[in-house]
């Protein structure tokens, strides 16, 4: 049996002030890896942030509404959070969701639009592809199961009322949560 991927998720109130996300990332990094000097931050080809001098520290950041989240692991990780809000869900689904995902939304009583969105975004953060690949990812299996993307583990996270969140890892994750 494969050992679970260990993931620590830090969450904090998010005030959207200039530099807030960077300050919170620095604080979370110091908690996750206390002996590590503050690592430099760089961005991959599609904008995924990483620490070039600390490749053993994989992380993913997301913020929405009043919350900021960051997942740390020794292996690649993707995390997304979305505040439930009024939006043109049908139009967005037609533009960014596969036909299987659109059908899933239609036959599901509580239409988990934001769960689907978070699953897609967390996968793209995991792979480092960026949001340009949003339409190409299908998070519903051919049998209609959700969340499901071959080769990865998608886990919906019930963190905050009125929000959806999803974690994407290479294997099932053992999650530890901590509020900053």
Residue ranges and their predicted role:
Residues 1-180:
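Core catalytic alpha/beta fold that binds nucleotide/phospho-ligands
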């Amino acid at each position: 049996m494969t050992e679970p991927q260990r993931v620590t998720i830090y969450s904090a109130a998010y005030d959207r002030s200039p530099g807030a996300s960077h300050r919170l990332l620095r604080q979370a990094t110091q908690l996750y890896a206390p002996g590590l000097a503050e690592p430099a931050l760089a961005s991959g080809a599609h904008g995924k942030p990483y620490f070039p001098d600390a490749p053993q520290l994989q992380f993913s950041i997301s913020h929405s509404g009043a919350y900021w989240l960051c997942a740390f692991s020794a292996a690649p990780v993707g995390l997304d959070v979305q505040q439930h809000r009024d939006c043109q869900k049908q139009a967005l689904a037609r533009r960014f969701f596969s036909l299987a995902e659109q059908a899933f939304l239609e036959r599901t009583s509580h239409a988990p639009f934001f769960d689907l969105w978070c699953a897609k975004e967390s996968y793209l953060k995991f792979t480092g592809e960026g949001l340009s690949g949003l339409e190409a990812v299908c998070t519903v299996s051919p049998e209609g199961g959700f969340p499901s993307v071959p080769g990865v583990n998608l886990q919906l996270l019930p963190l905050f009322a009125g929000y959806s969140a999803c974690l994407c890892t290479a294997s099932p994750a053992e999650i530890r949560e901590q509020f900053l």
